[in-house]
């Protein structure tokens, strides 16, 4: 897909996959609306990208905050064509029996409600304009339990179903909803997982994690017609065939 002149909204854009995606999409000619809770990192990133970028401080757990940010992106660039639901957290990592209920709920607010809020805010305008792409970062944790990750596993399983629901309800409206399970990525989240010392994922060597630009480049590829066959589904970047199609290997 030629994304030149298109507008992409990226949540969790301050670091990791989100920040890499901002650079990849901007390099491809897209306008990028950078969403994050703290302003410093996205202000710096927007300045580096230039006129194609706008920074929008936003709490994805609040629908009003997300709706306002999406509206500002549309006001600035004229449209919202692509939404990348990337914002997500995993801390505090804790066993169910000792998890703090409020902290557990906060992860659900960000990882699940944050995705719903983004989808809900963009769908009416995308439908009115004839379509758009809603890409959501998923996880292998959506498919099986991981020790001390009950909040993360539950939120990612629910997010997978949200993608399927959007496809079922709005696929005929031109909405391309696709999930991306990137595998383990060399980001701050893996630093936090490593520090926990809990479960086999925390024991992985750093060099087995893929670089953050891989999922970023996959997200760009997912905006093109080659990915149409995957609408309503979840792609796994562990798949070597997919890596080849994206041009990663």
Labelled PLM ranges:
Residues 119, 155:
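Active-site helix of classical SDR
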Residues 144, 160, 165-175:
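Active-site-adjacent segment of SDR/Rossmann-fold oxidoreductases
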Residues 57-68, 101:
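The beta1-alpha1 cofactor-binding region of Rossmann-like NAD(H)/NADP(H)-dependent oxidoreductases
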Residues 139:
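Residue(s) in the substrate-gating loop at a strand-loop-helix junction
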Residues 94-96, 103-105:
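Substrate-binding pocket helix/loop in short-chain dehydrogenase/reductase
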Residues 175, 179-182, 187, 196-245:
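C-terminal helical subdomain
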């Amino acid at each position: 897909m030629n994304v030149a002149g298109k507008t992409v909204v990226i949540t969790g854009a301050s670091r990791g996959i989100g920040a890499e995606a901002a650079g990849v999409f901007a390099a491809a000619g897209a306008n990028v609306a950078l969403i994050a809770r703290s302003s410093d990192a996205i202000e710096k990133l927007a300045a580096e990208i230039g006129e194609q970028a706008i920074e929008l401080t936003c709490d994805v757990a609040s629908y009003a905050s997300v709706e306002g940010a999406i509206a500002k992106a549309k006001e600035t660039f004229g449209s919202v064509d692509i939404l990348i639901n990337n914002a997500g957290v995993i801390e505090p990592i804790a066993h169910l029996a000792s998890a703090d209920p409020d902290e557990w709920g906060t992860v659900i607010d960000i990882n699940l409600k944050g995705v719903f809020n983004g989808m809900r805010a963009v769908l009416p305008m995308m439908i009115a304009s004839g379509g758009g792409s809603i890409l959501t970062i998923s996880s292998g944790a959506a498919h099986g339990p991981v020790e001390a990750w009950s909040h993360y596993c539950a939120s990612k399983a629910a997010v997978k179903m949200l993608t399927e629901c959007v496809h079922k309800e709005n696929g005929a409206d031109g909405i391309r909803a696709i999930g991306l399970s990137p595998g383990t990525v060399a980001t701050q989240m893996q630093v936090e997982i490593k520090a926990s010392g809990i479960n086999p994922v925390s024991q992985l060597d750093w060099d087995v994690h893929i670089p953050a630009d891989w999922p970023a480049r996959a997200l760009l590829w997912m905006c093109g017609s080659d990915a149409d066959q995957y609408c309503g589904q979840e792609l796994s970047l562990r798949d070597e065939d997919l890596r080849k199609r994206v041009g990663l290997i």
